[in-house]
Amino acid sequence: MNIKKTINNILKVGWSLLLGGAILYWMYRGFDFQQVKDVLLHKMNWTWMLLSFPFGILAQTFRGWRWKQTLDPIGEHPRSSVSVNSIFMSYALSLLVPRIGEFARCGVLKRWDGISFPKSLGTVVTERIIDSLLVLLIAGCVFLLQIPVFLNFFDKTGTSMESILHQFTATGYIVTTICGIAILILLHFLLKKLSIYNKVKATLQGLWQGVASLKGVRNVPLFIGFTLGIWLCYFLHYFLTFQCFEATSHLSVMCGLVTFIIGSIAVVVPTPNGAGPWHFAVKTMLILYGISSNDALFFVLIVHSIQTLLVILLGIYAWISLSFTDKKMRKI
């Protein structure tokens, strides 16, 4: 059984790496990577990139504080520092194995603060539901406001959805189909995991307590503030990078929101930090807003790479910090 599970895990990781790598290869085939060095050293405004870093750190910090708040009503009280470091670790570990971070952060709380694993996992489910609903709400509002932009684009270029589909290359159809299949596979595994948890009474109770914990949140305005703060910081972490490049510095906040939302949806596809699907989705939307294909390729490659490096550094910091953190008595 363990061997079968190990093989399945290896296949999942291999599949995610293959998918992300295939999309990146298709996007950057024939791309002159020698120009990236020139852009990084001479054409990129590093001041704006550095200014975006605090917002990336704050987004994860707010997530850690919010998580602690959802655990308090169910009798679990992790330390704020451990909660935040668990978030830093979870994002870094998800670069190695997609989605593993959600389980890893629960493991960190159990190991250092004796927090019940099933209960903490239940609150993770709660958080995901809330974040998904918020993203969908923002997406709906943004796209309704941007309908004139899309119509104007089609009018100026003399195109329609029908003509776009006709111009869609065979490779484009393949990539889109692969992304769709990947989402279905992810849903399959999530449902399969859920069915396994349902067979374990203690875990089911923990999950339910985690979901129900939202009702007992003592400071609802603070919880809402953390939630909005998380996504505002994520957006600023992304949007400020527009100012790093001359080609994107003129783009509006609304354009930033559209590309940000599309990118956030694209990372649902299980690849390390959304590598591949995120590049494809954001690059496509930037082209829609008038950015050349080459400039869009530079933007998504550099921004994603640097922000991924930040995630790695935060993970290393968390690992070092936890190494010097005393462990509380564990709960069974």
Which residues does each PLM region occupy?
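Interfacial segments of multi-pass membrane proteins
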Residues: L109-S116, G210, F280-F298
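Membrane-embedded alpha-helical segments of transport systems
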Residues: A92-V97, L121-L144, F298-L313
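Hydrophobic, aromatic-rich membrane-embedded alpha-helical segments
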Residues: V84-R111
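Predominantly cytoplasmic-facing regulatory/coupling regions of multi-pass membrane proteins
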Residues: M1-F88, L145, F150-V267, I306-I332
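Membrane-interface alpha-helices at helix entry/exit sites of multi-pass transporters
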Residues: S80-S83, I100-E102, I115-I129, S292-I302
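Helix-loop junctions at the membrane interface of multi-pass solute transporters
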Residues: Q69-I74, L95, C106-D113, M285-L288
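Transmembrane alpha-helix interface/packing and boundary motifs in multi-pass membrane proteins
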Residues: M89-P98, V258-H279
